[in-house]
Swiss-Prot record:
ACP-binding: region residues: 257-261
Native species: Bordetella parapertussis (strain 12822 / ATCC BAA-587 / NCTC 13253)
Compartments reported by the entry: Cytoplasm
Pathway: Lipid metabolism; fatty acid biosynthesis
EC number: 2.3.1.180
Gene Ontology MF, one: beta-ketoacyl-acyl-carrier-protein synthase III activity
One GO term (biological process): secondary metabolite biosynthetic process
Free-text function comment from the UniProt entry: Catalyzes the condensation reaction of fatty acid synthesis by the addition to an acyl acceptor of two carbons from malonyl-ACP. Catalyzes the first condensation reaction which initiates fatty acid synthesis and may therefore play a role in governing the total rate of fatty acid production. Possesses both acetoacetyl-ACP synthase and acetyl transacylase activities. Its substrate specificity determines the biosynthesis of branched-chain and/or straight-chain of fatty acids.
Record: active site: C123, H256, N286
Protein known as: Beta-ketoacyl-[acyl-carrier-protein] synthase III
Family per similarity comment: Belongs to the thiolase-like superfamily. FabH family.
Comment text on domains: The last Arg residue of the ACP-binding site is essential for the weak association between ACP/AcpP and FabH.
Keyword Ribosomal protein belongs to the record: no
Subunit structure: Homodimer.
């Protein structure tokens, strides 16, 4: 009996979608001033590098953003809905408790059958989802997977907390992964440390028809910074070692777009020149699970990321979770 040839997962297309409403730092400062909260463009840029963010209008849902990003990724990949045999949505802001946001996206796209589910790993979510889809494709359980990161984080922000409300935006990014004979995704590592849950969390829950606990995002910024740069540095080196490449071989580093300070510090630790780091946090702010696919899509469409190049994508977020995916484009 002939042995079945190993299949690999390769990125065939990408897409991104941002809400139409753009809120600059000056816009946000003016809005917060009506609440007697003081901030400014200079204060936000100096600490985060963020200059603006996109915010969804009331009534716009995560599944709607995800669907638009998915359609653009499918167009880019040249695939039809009936070719999609897996949909994974990474989100911490689902439309419903259930069904999954992925099921809603499947219905919106007119896709049928195939595994369809959500992954919740906050800002690491897209890397978790991509690794999951890669495993299914390698195992021969899927051939064409739609992997999406989508969030409306503006719905879980405390707009009276200057330390967090200026950091986040809404949006969605997606990739199509297709089975291929040659490796696209070379290696992936996922990790978590549940003892660090309280440094970044939204602890509310639904019970008996009411939201109980604190429904808003809370963050210990200094603890998150320290954890993020430590684990991402180690994860990058581990995933490169598994793939048999050096960090210097990476053409593009696409980390989770949390804060420009984290991005710059990580680049220095890895000795990756800043011109080889894709940075979109200035325009998008932190879009949680959407940040990595949005950044990848921007860099593919503006011509920076080219076929054949080596790209390292990294996520880090609440849980505390982190992970890396190394891919040949």
């Amino acid at each position: 009996m002939m042995e079945k040839a190993m299949k690999y997962a390769k990125i065939a297309g990408s897409g991104g979608y941002l809400p139409e409403r753009v809120v600059t730092n000056d816009d946000l400062a003016a809005e917060l001033a009506t609440r007697q909260i003081s901030t400014s463009d200079e204060w936000i840029v100096e600490r985060t590098g963020i200059r603006q963010r996109h915010l969804a209008e009331r009534g716009v849902t995560t599944s709607q953003l995800a669907t638009e990003a998915a359609r653009r990724a499918m167009d880019d990949a040249g695939v039809q809905a009936d070719e999609i045999d897996m949909i994974i949505v990474a989100t911490s802001t689902p439309d419903y408790v259930f069904p999954s946001t992925a099921c809603l996206v499947q219905a919106n796209l007119g896709a049928k059958g195939g595994a369809t589910f959500d992954v919740q790993a906050v800002c690491s979510g897209f890397v978790y989802a991509m690794t999951t889809a890669d495993s299914f494709i390698r195992a021969g359980r899927a051939r064409c997977a739609l992997v999406i990161g989508a969030e409306v984080f503006s719905r879980i922000l405390d707009w009276n907390d200057r330390g967090t409300c200026v950091l986040f935006g809404d949006g969605a990014g997606a990739v199509v992964l297709k089975a291929a004979d040659e490796p696209g995704i070379l290696a992936a590592h996922l990790h978590a440390d549940g003892s660090q849950t309280k440094i970044l969390c939204a602890a509310g829950n639904v019970a008996y028809g009411d939201v109980t606990g604190d429904p808003f995002l809370r963050m210990d910024g200094q603890a998150v910074f320290k954890q993020a740069v430590t684990v991402l540095d180690r994860s990058a080196r581990d995933v490169c070692a598994e793939a048999g490449v050096e960090v210097d071989d990476i053409d593009w580093l696409i980390p989770h777009q949390a804060n420009v300070r984290i991005l710059n510090f990580l680049a220095r630790k890895l000795r990756v020149p800043t011109e080889r780091v894709v940075i979109t946090v200035d325009q998008h702010a932190n879009t949680s699970a959407a940040s990595v696919p949005l950044a990848l899509d921007v860099a593919r469409r503006d011509g920076r990321v080219k076929p054949g190049q080596l790209v390292l994508m990294q996520g880090v977020g609440g849980g505390f979770t982190w992970g890396s995916v190394l891919a040949r484009m």
